[in-house]
Amino acid sequence: MAAESLPFTLETVSSWELEAWYEDLQEVLSSDEIGGTYISSPGNEEEESKTFTTLDPASLAWLTEEPGPTEVTRTSQSPRSPDSSQSSMAQEEEEEEQGRTRKRKQSGQCPARPGKQRMKEKEQENERKVAQLAEENERLKQEIERLTREVETTRRALIDRMVSLHQA
């Protein structure tokens, strides 16, 4: 198994990024507590016939590598008793997940691919920093050239003055 790079750097992480990671973790953990979760892997046809509930697409997004929308299908529904309290609890959980998704959409993050979105934002931020540092570098070069010219003129003036004092 090949080692994968971390989806983040070891630098300081912004609070909104930490909050998004925390929400993603909560979604994954809560889906694990609900029932046996099943993520189909290639060449696993015999296990696909088992009864599992599937994860919310937002919680699966960080697991997928290929671009495009995440497709999650329900292979079969877990049996529910006619007890209304269980069905109302399931509805409440679904509403909570939808609320979290809406909250994330409102904060400007894409729930379908939060890891890739963060990486893209980080890359854009790094490009802005590079451009900003290049501008600062150019400004500093010009300042160095200006100061070098100023030192040269001051040095010449000082030499001329010393020469004129010795001649007098």
UniProtKB/Swiss-Prot annotation:
Segments for region (Leucine-zipper): 133-147
Ranges of biased composition (kind: Low complexity): 73-88
Entry PTM: Ubiquitinated, leading to its degradation by the proteasome.
Effect after changing S30A: Loss of phosphorylation
A GO molecular function held by the record: protein homodimerization activity
Domain of life of the organism encoding this protein: Eukaryota
Primary residence: cytoplasm
bZIP domain mapped to chain residues: 98-161
Residue ranges the record marks as coiled coil: none
Region Basic motif: start-end pairs: 100-129
Start-end of Basic and acidic residues biased regions: 118-139
Region of interest called Interaction with TRIB3, as start-end residue ranges on this chain: 10-18
Region annotated Disordered, chain positions: 34-139
GO cellular component: CHOP-ATF3 complex; CHOP-ATF4 complex; CHOP-C/EBP complex; cytoplasm; late endosome; nucleoplasm; nucleus; protein-DNA complex
Location of the protein in the cell: Cytoplasm; Nucleus
An individual GO BP term: vascular associated smooth muscle cell proliferation
Alphabetized UniProt keyword annotations: Activator, Apoptosis, Cell cycle, Cytoplasm, DNA-binding, Growth arrest, Nucleus, Phosphoprotein, Repressor, Stress response, Transcription, Transcription regulation, Ubl conjugation, Unfolded protein response, Wnt signaling pathway
Subunit and partners: Heterodimer. Interacts with TCF7L2/TCF4, EP300/P300, HDAC5 and HDAC6. Interacts with TRIB3 which blocks its association with EP300/P300. Interacts with FOXO3, and CEBPB. Interacts with ATF4. Interacts with HDAC1.
The family this protein is said to belong to: Belongs to the bZIP family.
Protein name: DNA damage-inducible transcript 3 protein
Species this chain originates from: Mus musculus
